[in-house]
Amino acid sequence: MPSAHTLPVLDLSQADDPAQRADFLKQLHAAARDTGFLHLTGHGVTAAESARILELTRAFFALPEADRLAVSNLNSPHFRGYTRIGHELTGGASDWRDQLDVGAERPAPVVGPDDPAFLWLEGPNQWPAALPELRTVVLDWQSRLAAVAHRLLQELLVAIGAPADFFDEAFAERPHLHTKLIRYPGSAPSGADQGVGAHKDYGFLTLLLQDSVGGLQVVRDGGYVDVPPMPGAFVVNLGELLEIATEGYLTATDHRVVSPPGAVERYSVPFFYNPRLDAVIETVPGEYLRSAPGVAHDDSNPLHAQYGRNELKGWVRAHPAVARRWHPELASV
């Protein structure tokens, strides 16, 4: 059985205090290199803001099924909208959860035959007519967390001895923002406990807001350990592109969610902060590279320097029904 475990806890407000800044950067460096996961406090997002988005997350999943299916992601060539329980795949197996996927609110692109297919990942969201306040709250939340994530990314670069603005151009103008509202509806009838299967996030930074139920587990010392919820903190983890951009110096860590027991429901709101789809990710300069071990490549999961190719691959593999309906030519991505 996994044992209880506490991740490193970092207070982002210490970065603004000259007396504490050096210690904060040291702790951030260690957490990003050794663990790839941390609890983040001092981020400026209020308890009321967090409570509100969790309240509306619960309200969305309390809507009649017909209202949720009206915004099904099967309606969207941009992979936006509601995914029914068991209709998302991780590692080829069904996840026992349902969710609403939201990105930056942008017009549908005109994608020509010679344009990169990842341009389809931009476009409008789908919003439930029965819960009109959801749009404003989620988009505001997305903007708030993008600012927190960008600040944290800059501090992380400083912590490893790199220029703070190294990734600013890659995130300029149209960063790829993505928020999920997720429900884990208790145990699956089959007895399987895969709320979401083991995986690494393939992008840059993830900031997770979770309720009090728990279920997140992270690999440490060769086994999975529990990550109990910490009130007022986001769980932050690094994605594979940060590991690649630092030649394996920083760590992207496998994690999963175990379904809650019985009829207990778990709600969470992960936010993913990633660069423009057309951004090409280069190696971060710095003396740290002398200690970088390099990256082990997985032939079954190739990672590309151009961010959008990774993002598209992830969506096609996780939501094959959407891909078959709108993008059958991408089945082999």
Whereabouts are the PLM-identified features?
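Core domains of carbohydrate- and sulfate-ester-processing enzymes
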Residues: 86-117
